[in-house]
């Protein structure tokens, strides 16, 4: 089946579709971070990620194999899916992998921040860049305005979350700046891997280094 054969729901404009998808992304990632923060231990979270991830990936495979199932799913989720996802694997697959990695390797505060960097900072950068982006970052399709918005939001989030966990001490403002910069650089980087994969992992590593050595 060709991509052009699939009739996904349409909105009034491509920009509106993009914003809806980003807001959905933001709400889901924020919910995941909240649930991990409030209700789950590392071990419980890893078990849940493995279980849900396996079910989701199997469902995605069946969706791509059976056109009728794919059409039914598109009627519900078509508005929040990227065009290339209509006939290929969902972008949730690399996110599930990244989520498992950051939860397994890092402490809860760092893992939560990695999720929020992707779930809040990335959509903010995208939406601001879409409507206000005029200056392109060198060597990328990303805008300076989106980068700056991501940096500001990610820095503030880092300060709030780390302060809540009593981390950072006197170096907290500097660590927050480094965390925000790391997240925004990861989002703006021209890496060929999916943002859902490299943004959480790279930003978690940078935040861990900052907390360890500052």
Question: How would you name each of these model-derived features?
Answer:
Residues 44-56:
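Alpha-helical transmembrane segments
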Residues 2-47, 61-157, 161, 170-213:
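Interhelical loop and helix-boundary elements at the membrane-water interface
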